[in-house]
Design a protein with these regions (language model features):
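Extended hydrophobic leader/signal-anchor segments used for secretion and membrane insertion
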Residues: 1-314
Length: 314
């Protein structure tokens, strides 16, 4: 074989390998385990490098297409990484004794929308419920005992006039204030999440409000919280939901739209197991709708070989 033919053969082999690496995987969602972000019948795609995904490996809170122990395929979210001590406590994910904080983009994929009371003339919006339960409109027929959710908040779009204005967000005993620029649209997310007081506000450059995700949160959010303070922020709040959640504007501004949200409320396994010590080749995967998901709480941790490809954000 001449050097030219060898080079041509290597080039062809490389092209075939590139096509194989770039094959997008498509999967039709079956079931409610990843609701509300993914609903039955949704078609999800991994993009163009699923094999490269496997080489890179999963990261916490990413959604992956996995092979279950019975050989079926399912989409799940990464909860625990190899060699970690992982547990579920009060509905939250705890790793090494510390509650893991979700970023805004993860919250946008897992949150469940709630109704908010909005008073545009007064520039005020609030989450009126004294108790928030892990109920969902998309699975009312699922027979389960509801539990109290401690993590909830508000999302809003505010519009200012020709003058700068002020914004105040109140969560439990804490108040966060922002100065709003003139002639601007501003998005806000604020509430209690994973044992923290969280908030982020950013300028929305769209001419009009973009469609939100099924969670009720914007499809595009910042990567990190601008406020992430340990809870409790006031006396007597350690074990109680932040029942008082409100936002208010002052000056030349109005609340264009507002809604409530609650976080996913994790539950232990059916047999009561709520903690796992992962070995060097094990991962804990969970569903976004815990009472409708079969995941590591039943299967146990999954080996690295079970992960097929990453599902797009959030």
């Amino acid at each position: 074989m001449t050097a030219r033919r060898l080079a041509a053969g290597i080039a062809i082999l490389g092209a075939v390998l590139a096509v194989w690496l770039a094959r997008p995987a498509r999967f039709v969602v079956d079931g409610l385990s990843m609701a509300p972000g993914l609903m039955p019948g949704d078609l999800v795609s991994t993009g163009w490098l699923p094999a490269a995904d496997r080489l890179h490996g999963p990261a916490r809170f990413e959604r992956w297409l996995v092979t279950a122990p019975d050989g079926t395929r399912a989409v799940k979210r990464i909860g625990g990484l190899p060699s970690e001590a992982v547990s579920i406590r009060d509905g939250d994910l705890v790793v090494g004794g510390t509650t893991v904080l979700k970023g805004p983009s993860v919250l946008a994929g897992v949150a469940v929308p709630l109704a908010a009371a909005v008073d545009p003339p007064r520039g005020h919006a609030m989450l009126p419920a004294d108790e928030i339960l892990d109920d969902v409109a998309f699975a009312r027929e699922v027979n389960r005992t509801l539990e109290t959710v401690r993590d909830a908040g508000l999302v809003a779009r505010l519009v200012t006039g020709t003058a700068a204005a002020g914004l105040r967000a109140t969560v439990g005993g804490a108040t966060i204030r922002w100065r709003l620029p003139a002639a601007a649209a501003v998005r806000l997310i604020a509430g209690r999440l994973d044992g923290r007081l969280v908030a982020v506000a950013w300028r929305d450059h769209a001419a009009r409000a973009a469609d939100d995700l099924r969670s009720g949160l914007p499809a595009r959010v910042p990567e990190a919280w601008s406020v992430a303070t340990e809870w409790p922020v006031g006396p007597g709040e350690a074990d109680q939901p932040p029942c008082s959640i409100a936002i208010a504007v002052a000056g030349d501004a109005r609340i264009e739209r507002a809604a409530g949200w609650r976080d996913v409320h994790l539950r232990p396994a059916a047999d009561g197991v709520a903690s796992w010590q992962l070995d060097a080749n094990s991962w804990l995967v969970l569903g976004d709708f815990p009472t409708g998901s079969i995941d590591s709480r039943r299967w146990g941790p999954l080996p690295t070989a079970a992960f097929r490809c990453r599902i797009g954000r959030p």
